[in-house]
Curated annotation (Swiss-Prot):
One of its GO terms (molecular function) is rRNA binding. Binds to the 23S rRNA. One of its GO terms (cellular component) is ribonucleoprotein complex. One of its GO terms (biological process) is translation. This is Large ribosomal subunit protein bL9. InterPro entries: Ribosomal_bL9, Ribosomal_bL9/RNase_H1_N, Ribosomal_bL9_bac/chp, Ribosomal_bL9_C, Ribosomal_bL9_C_sf, Ribosomal_bL9_N, Ribosomal_bL9_N_sf. PANTHER family: 50S RIBOSOMAL PROTEIN L9.
Amino acid sequence: MQVILLEKVINLGSLGDIVRVKDGYARNFLIPTKRARRATQSAIAEFEVKRAELEKVAAEKLAAAQAEGEKLNGLTVQITQKSGVDGRLFGSVTNADIAEALAGQGFKLEKAQVRMPSGPLKVVGDHPVSVALHTDVVVDVTVAVLGEHV
């Protein structure tokens, strides 16, 4: 199925690109989340009329994400978990825990925006974590996991 992208989609294209994707991907993800539209002649003509407005909205989202990223970049978040004597945690610190800790500091994030390349944190210490605020704005945050000896 051919679709017109209404915003930048990772590994697919940017605003205004007409791309071919599998029917299920378009029907179940891109179209319901308003990231794309079916590429019919009328939709293409309508898109060209609204193109400037959509580009302006995309630029505003990017500017807002960059402003939020400047505040968030280099921030250290402290999370306390129960741990054993050897420094290993009972349980782990997940992206949901980090998003919740950042929400406590006034940042509005979803857990999917917190990227943890090595998986959940299972030891006490400082760990680098990436936060994707926008497809073009990814900032680094340090998570300090503090052990609470039991």
